[in-house]
């Protein structure tokens, strides 16, 4: 049975109605109806309801959001300041709004696809993002998200004990820079040096524990202890196997939700406790997305 709940909301006309909330899976994601993000960008009560739903479901989906770029940016800024992406430039008229275009002239390459959490190679990774589709392919182009709170909760107890207190290095080289020419890659890394974060971070709003490793994570920085390592050659095999195991938790379908975009669909996600994957299965069709990334805080 579909579990649909309702909360007060404001429709496009400005009259108060109810947000319809339909969970997409038992783990993560909810589809919202009867809410317009242009109105939410200006209405404190409505925005507070959407934000509370985001904390509960971790990623929210909406259809038929015929809003302007200015409204898109204004809504995203209710969560915090926006940041430019180092690889994809912002709209000159709307700083912080990034266009992600794929079409016939785009290279049909898959190297950029990986489960990841945005900008963990920064000292303060993004809080989250508001992504709107302005043109979608007839087939394909879905996105998936994974609940990294549940991924942590379902780890065996002995693994939780092993990773308690572990820290890890995150590098822009591990994904975006992987296919770049050496000089460009080194320049990018010089501009965005590696960051170090706890392997298990705490959600600053909910207090939940989060498994915080992803495709940008290169290695643990404090695995080399007398308990873990007898000799130097123990460090790499032991830590690499553990890191690969932890990174692979995002691949578990029970932790995931999958969303099919159409024109004016919007996804809003909490980057602190999720990972996502954009499926590249639609070339040479066109998919045009616009994303506002929100500056986050330092993981602890």
Question: What are the language-model segments listed below?
Answer:
Residues 2-266, 271-300:
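Non-heme Fe(II) oxygenase catalytic core, chiefly the N-lobe of the double-stranded beta-helix
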């Amino acid at each position: 049975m579909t579990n649909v709940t309702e909360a007060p909301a404001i429709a496009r006309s400005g009259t108060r109605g109810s947000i319809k909330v339909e969970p997409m899976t038992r783990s993560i994601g909810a589809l919202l109806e009867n809410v317009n993000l242009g109105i939410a960008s200006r209405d404190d009560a409505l925005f507070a309801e959407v934000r509370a739903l985001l904390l509960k479901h971790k990623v929210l989906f909406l259809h038929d959001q015929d809003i302007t770029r200015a409204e898109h940016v204004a809504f995203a800024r209710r969560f915090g300041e926006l940041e430019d992406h180092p690889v994809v430039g912002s709209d000159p008229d709307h700083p912080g709004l990034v266009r992600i275009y794929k079409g016939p002239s785009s290279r049909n390459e898959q190297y950029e696809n990986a489960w990841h959490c945005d900008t963990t190679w920064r000292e303060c990774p993004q809080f989250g993002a508001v992504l709107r589709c302005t043109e979608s392919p007839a087939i394909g182009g879905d996105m998936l998200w994974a609940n990294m709170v549940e991924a942590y909760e379902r780890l065996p107890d002995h693994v939780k004990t092993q990773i308690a207190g572990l820290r890890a290095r995150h590098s822009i080289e591990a994904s975006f820079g992987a296919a770049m020419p050496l000089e460009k890659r080194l320049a990018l890394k010089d501009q965005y040096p590696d960051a170090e974060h706890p392997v298990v971070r705490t959600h600053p709003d909910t207090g939940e524990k989060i498994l915080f490793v992803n495709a940008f994570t290169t290695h643990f920085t404090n695995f080399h202890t007398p308990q873990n390592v007898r000799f130097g050659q123990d460090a790499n095999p032991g830590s690499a196997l553990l890191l690969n195991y932890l990174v692979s938790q995002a691949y578990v379908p029970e932790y995931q939700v999958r969303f099919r975009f159409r024109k004016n669909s919007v996804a809003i996600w909490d980057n602190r406790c999720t990972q996502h994957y954009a499926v590249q299965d639609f070339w040479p069709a066109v998919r045009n997305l616009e994303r506002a990334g929100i500056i986050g805080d330092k993981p602890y």
